[in-house]
């Protein structure tokens, strides 16, 4: 997924920006669980969700989303209010192997996993909830 952003444009042809955190000391499985919460949402809503998410990986994902928003604002002059999470994924980084002493002289191998977190934000028009929005529920 290295071609997510080319010349400031996403795959969909929308202007955007990208941020990556590499070698984060979080398991990719746990980080993916947090990234799935915010994929496809507006950037401000994603930051609010991550701020109050109970998972430990949410702080790392929060920093990457905030960095992507700052990159879009400073490098491409995009309005932060129109930014959405276009692509967000977690790749597996190198695994650090450690030894844990166990009973009777044995030793277990401990795998400390790392991950690379990537977030691409794109600028879209804000969705309006005007008169065309349906607010009543259908009777059963």
Swiss-Prot record:
Source species, domain of life: Bacteria
InterPro entries: Ribosomal_uL22, Ribosomal_uL22_bac/chlpt-type, Ribosomal_uL22_bac/org-type, Ribosomal_uL22_CS, Ribosomal_uL22_sf
UniProt KW keywords: Ribonucleoprotein, Ribosomal protein, RNA-binding, rRNA-binding
GO biological process: translation
GO molecular-function term, one example from the UniProt record: structural constituent of ribosome
Gene Ontology CC entries for this record: cytosolic large ribosomal subunit
Family matches, as PANTHER family: CHLOROPLAST 50S RIBOSOMAL PROTEIN L22-RELATED, LARGE RIBOSOMAL SUBUNIT PROTEIN UL22M
Protein family: Belongs to the universal ribosomal protein uL22 family.
Role noted for this protein: This protein binds specifically to 23S rRNA; its binding is stimulated by other ribosomal proteins, e.g. L4, L17, and L20. It is important during the early stages of 50S assembly. It makes multiple contacts with different domains of the 23S rRNA in the assembled 50S subunit and ribosome.
Assembly notes: Part of the 50S ribosomal subunit.
Stated name of the protein: Large ribosomal subunit protein uL22
């Amino acid at each position: 997924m290295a071609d997510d952003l080319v010349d400031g444009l996403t795959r969909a042809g929308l202007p955007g920006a990208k941020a990556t955190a590499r070698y984060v000391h979080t398991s990719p499985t746990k980080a993916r669980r947090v990234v799935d919460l915010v994929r496809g949402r507006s950037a401000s809503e994603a930051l609010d969700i991550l701020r109050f998410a109970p998972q430990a990986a949410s702080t790392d994902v929060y920093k990457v989303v905030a960095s992507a928003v700052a990159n879009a604002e400073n490098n491409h002059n995009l309005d932060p209010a129109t930014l959405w999470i276009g692509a967000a994924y977690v790749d597996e980084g190198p695994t650090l192997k450690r030894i844990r002493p166990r009973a009777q002289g044995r030793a277990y191998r401990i795998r400390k996993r790392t991950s690379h977190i990537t977030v691409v934000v794109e600028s879209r028009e804000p969705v309006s909830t005007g008169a065309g929005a349906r607010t009543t529920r259908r009777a059963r």
